[in-house]
């Protein structure tokens, strides 16, 4: 067990010579603009990334976003893994991710498919995003995501390295020690309605970006399914 206050008291003098700098005040949050970008290369597979502006580290919806990510493509029980890989056999690797930063963030989906299946796979991903925006996730699906997230947090806490990283992140990003129990309680408090509203705000079609790396030369069909 790490006593945060005791640790700061003992280590603080070693850093007295380092003076705090001024916060960066002139920052403009980037505004994502949807577009399709092709990077043609003669590859066996097409690497596809769908992205959208996400949440910042301090956004109170970040716990809902974590659960949304888990449900969408965060594990083998996720919607993308089941639909794209298990049912359709379109991709071996498919997952979603979230990357929160100080003032903004990014949510994304990655998959690699046969070039002949790239359009079909992209359409299926968009279909799954539309489903998340259309109705709340089921109680069972939400419960599974909560339990998975709690399990991941508890397993990570067994690592000394993860504990040190967690202490540093709390100090740098939040200026306070956030107990694991507090995080778990906030995860457990997320409702299906909150996830639905978050999905609607994130997965707006004209803000989605699509990048394809591989042997695709015509972006027209992808623009058609993405923006029409």
Predicted feature residues:
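Charge-rich, well-structured scaffold segments of protease-associated domains
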Residues: 1-22, 38, 56, 64, ...
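His/Glu-based metal-binding/catalytic segments typifying zinc-dependent metallopeptidases
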Residues: 12, 23-78, 216
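Catalytic cores of enzymes that engage adenine nucleotides and/or redox cofactors via long glycine-rich
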Residues: 28-32, 83, 109
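Generic alpha-helical structural context detector
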Residues: 69-73, 82, 147, 169
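M16/MPP (pitrilysin/insulinase) zinc-metallopeptidase core fold and M16-derived inactive scaffolds
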Residues: 74-90
